[in-house]
Swiss-Prot record:
It comes from Nephroselmis olivacea. The gene is chlB. GO terms for cellular component: chloroplast. Protochlorophyllide reductase is composed of three subunits; ChlL, ChlN and ChlB. Forms a heterotetramer of two ChlB and two ChlN subunits. [4Fe-4S] cluster binds at D36. Substrate binds at G431, M432. Belongs to the ChlB/BchB/BchZ family. It holds the Pfam family Oxidored_nitro. Binds 1 [4Fe-4S] cluster per heterodimer. The cluster is bound at the heterodimer interface by residues from both subunits. This is Light-independent protochlorophyllide reductase subunit B.
Length: 531
């Protein structure tokens, strides 16, 4: 645990609450002080569901600190059991209330005999793991809690469904495009002739857990949550699982191939049908294959980008950029340090550098050092891109409200491939808008350009520019101006120029090979919008 003003993944109790709020008729009781109870507000703002978030805060105040928490926690459990009649009540402390070292397990044990609902204490180390790890562990804990007693008594129905079926495990509230990904994956499986046995936890219920063992296989679209549940089902009921994420045409084809292989082990051969299905969707349904061969996409060849996010999205987007669009990924990274080995294995050979860190300042420093043409990352990388004047597309959580759209925008499957291709192309294209306004004119272009230039110069780190130097810098196209400006300032600091004048600019051009021919090459050959 460390103090930080930005975290890529939240504290563990957020993962617990996301599991509870994703299920139908499951209620969470959070034992926490005021200040830790922001989940309801955050969930209401981002998810925009019609229903209230099923989370109740058992507030730790001065009275509780003086008399103990047992009476309050037990009373809250009994009250929510009577009011809401949930199938399961999930009790969790937060990292703050864990400092009190209270025996919440004992409180739950005292309350459970007098409730109609199942009551379960979230078994996670709040100081050792973060949000993504917690939701993975808690989902597995809930599944075990429901299925193990029936399995031990031999009353659990494990008869496979008569036709091929799958469990979709790993869709959560506040997940990055999870609602739309779930719809698209259902549609893809329907086209492949696969029935949906259960979906967990988003949209699922506790009674659905009794049916999990009837599926032919499990699908885990995101490594961050659901993998522990899939491994438990494989060990206990011998149900295979697929953990490949179908983002991009190549990965979607491999995903379908893994489904075909599982069906063949059950004596079902659909090879010919699946081949026709893939060809039809790659040539007609998905526009991404055609787009990759278009002149617009050809202009993206060799572009230098940085990718950063969770393991699943960072790895799959990196491979899509390199294999399907020919874009040069100079650095790919993830904040999921616990899954570093898998991530390195996935992106090895596709990138120049690999960055594994939870520190957003290291990511910002890497972006500043490598100066890519675009960034594909989280909301934090979007902020960094705005500061450095580098366009950024958000491809991973954490994200803001614009990445919880009301419209249908999946990342998985063939429709998701179209969405991702649009995101990639528009990220580059929008980076040219300011320059095109400057070049061809627009409303108040001159005033806007001058004010932005003045702001840019005023933000220089310890470097003063003469009016002549500012005028010369203004002649450089906007999309490479910030790069030329940083290179010139770096040259001035290294060679002891207190003020940047025309002589300093010309010497910097010579030393870094940033001359007029280079700028013209960038302007007329390297950018997509200038023909």
């Amino acid at each position: 645990m460390k103090l930080a003003y930005w975290m890529y993944a939240g504290p563990a109790h957020l993962g617990v609450l996301r599991v509870a709020s994703s299920f139908k008729n499951v209620h969470a009781i959070m034992h926490a002080p005021l200040g830790d109870d922001y989940f309801n507000v955050m969930s209401s703002m981002l998810e925009r569901d019609r229903d209230f978030t099923p989370v109740t805060a058992s507030i730790v105040d001065r009275h509780v600190l003086a008399t103990g928490s047992q009476r309050k926690v037990v009373a809250t459990i009994h009250r929510k059991d009577q009011e809401d009649e949930p199938d399961l009540i999930l009790v969790t402390p937060t990292c703050t209330s864990s400092i009190l070292q209270e025996d919440l397990g004992n409180y739950v044990a005292r309350a459970a005999p007098y409730t109609k609902s199942e009551v379960l204490l979230a078994d996670v180390q709040h100081y050792r793991i973060h949000e993504l790890q917690a939701q993975d562990r808690i989902l597995e804990q809930v599944v075990r809690h429901i299925m193990d007693p029936e399995r031990q008594k031999g009353t659990l129905d494990t008869t496979p469904t008569p036709t091929p079926s799958a469990n979709l495990i790993g869709f959560f509230d506040l997940g990055f495009h999870h609602r739309d990904d779930s719809r698209e994956l259902r549609r893809l499986l329907h086209g492949l002739g696969i029935e949906i046995n259960s979906v967990l936890p988003k949209g699922g219920s506790i009674p659905d857990l009794h049916q999990l063992a009837k599926a032919w296989f499990n699908i885990i679209p995101y490594r961050e949550a659901g993998l522990m549940t899939a491994k438990y089902l494989e060990e206990s009921f011998h149900i295979p699982y697929i953990d490949r994420t179908p983002i991009g045409l190549i990965e979607t084809r491999k995903f379908i191939g893994e489904i075909e292989a599982i069906l063949q082990t059950r004596g079902v051969d659909r090879h010919e049908y699946y081949e026709k299905f893939i060809i039809h969707h790659e040539t007609i349904v998905s526009q991404a294959a055609w787009f990759a061969r278009s002149i617009d996409c050809q202009n993206l060849l060799g572009k230098r980008v940085i990718v950063f996010g969770d393991c699943t999205h960072a790895a799959t987007i990196t491979k899509l950029l390199v294999r399907e669009l020919g874009i040069h990924v100079v650095c790919a990274g993830t904040y999921c340090k616990y899954d570093e080995a898998w991530f390195r294995e996935q992106v090895n050979g596709y990138v120049d550098e690999i960055l594994i860190t939870e520190d957003h300042t290291q990511v910002a420093d890497t972006i500043s050092r490598l100066e890519p043409a675009a960034i594909f990352g989280t909301q934090m990388e979007r902020h960094v891109g705005k500061r450095l004047d580098i366009p950024c597309g958000v491809i991973s959580a954490p994200a803001h409200i614009q990445n919880f759209p009301l419209s249908f925008r999946p990342f998985l499957g063939y429709e998701g491939t179209n969405v991702v291709a649009d995101l990639i192309y528009n990220t580059f294209r929008l980076g040219m808008e300011d320059h095109l306004l400057e070049l061809f004119g627009g409303h108040d272009t001159k005033q806007i350009g001058e004010s932005q230039m003045a702001e840019s110069i005023s933000n220089s780190k310890g470097c003063q520019w003469t009016p002549e130097a500012e005028k010369e810098l203004a002649h450089i196209p906007r999309f490479v101006r910030s790069k030329v400006k940083r290179a010139t300032e770096r040259f001035a600091q290294e060679h002891g120029y207190p003020v940047i004048n025309l002589e300093c600019i010309y010497l910097a051009k010579q030393s870094t090979s940033v001359d007029i021919e280079t700028i013209q090459h960038l302007l007329f050959n390297d950018e997509t919008e200038v023909q």
